[in-house]
Design a protein with these regions (language model features):
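STAS-typified acidic loop motif
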Residues: 1-11
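Acidic-enriched, low-complexity/disordered segments with a strong bias for Aspartate over Glutamate
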Residues: 22, 37, 120-123, 143, ...
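Hydrophobic alpha-helical membrane-association signature
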Residues: 9-16, 52, 87
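Conserved catalytic cores of soluble enzyme domains
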Residues: 40-171
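Intrinsically disordered, low-complexity segments enriched in small/flexible residues
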Residues: 158-229
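Generic hydrophobic-segment detector
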Residues: 10, 29-30, 78, 130
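A structural preference for short, pocket-lining loop segments at secondary-structure junctions
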Residues: 12-43
């Protein structure tokens, strides 16, 4: 269908978030978990879908401002792209497994608009180096990497709900400073292995091939933890 966000789906999610916001401090939910597996907006409902995305983002900000953490869990075959990727980035914390991918423009979209020379969507290794879960986790684009079982996601969510940062100006300022420093250190890198090598990650060319257990022993880049999330 080209995505999962249309008028009806967007309205349902928006209603869920507003109900959580209105229940803050009155016995409502203590957290909101979004299980995202989406390419973004349904192409058949482009305008309605884009409007739904913007309203959902606004609602997430309201829920977080009310003191309720919003967690994104990404691990399906579609990942979280387009508006779904932006929604993911707005959450308090993000949990991914090896098959999860998070990005704004999907590989096919980039290839269609810029050509295969710019981005080959069929190059699986390239796609995972750019927007795959391991790249996102090491660089701070996500907050927790799990092995992929339901129980793994559940345990990670329970921990992260308790450590979600407040949604306030100092948090956003600290996050902007972190991103500025990341751009300064790695802005001239052309591929993920260059970033890992510069950051001191051992054998960066093998990141995609090692087991989850081995990957989880790797030290993240200093300053990778998100302040805004």
């Amino acid at each position: 269908m080209g995505g999962a966000f249309g008028e009806v789906h967007g309205a349902k999610l928006l209603g869920l978030l507003r109900a959580a916001r209105d229940g803050a401090g009155r016995g409502g939910p203590r957290a909101v978990l979004l299980l995202l597996d989406t390419g973004g907006v349904r192409l058949q409902e482009a305008n309605a879908g884009e409007l739904a995305i913007s309203e959902i983002i606004h609602a997430i900000v309201q829920v977080r401002s009310a003191g309720i953490p919003v967690l994104a869990l990404v691990g399906g075959r579609s990942g979280a792209f387009g508006g779904g990727g932006i929604i993911t980035a707005c959450c308090s914390r993000i949990i991914v497994s090896q098959h999860g991918r998070v990005s704004v423009s999907g590989p096919e979209v980039i290839e269609t608009n810029k050509g295969v020379e710019e981005f080959d969507a069929k190059d699986r290794a390239l796609v995972w180096r750019v927007c795959g879960a391991r790249t996102r986790y090491l660089s701070g684009g996500t907050d927790r990497y799990v092995k992929g079982g339901i129980e793994d996601y559940r345990e990670a969510a329970i921990v992260l709900v308790k450590h979600a940062p407040p949604f306030a100006l100092p948090t956003l300022t600290a996050e902007q400073q972190r991103l500025t420093e990341r751009l300064r250190r790695f802005g001239d890198c052309r591929d993920a292995p260059e970033i890992w090598r510069k950051a001191g990650v051992p054998e960066p060319e093998r990141i995609a091939d090692i087991t989850d257990d081995t990957f989880l022993t790797i030290q993240r880049i200093q300053g990778a933890d998100h302040d805004a999330r």
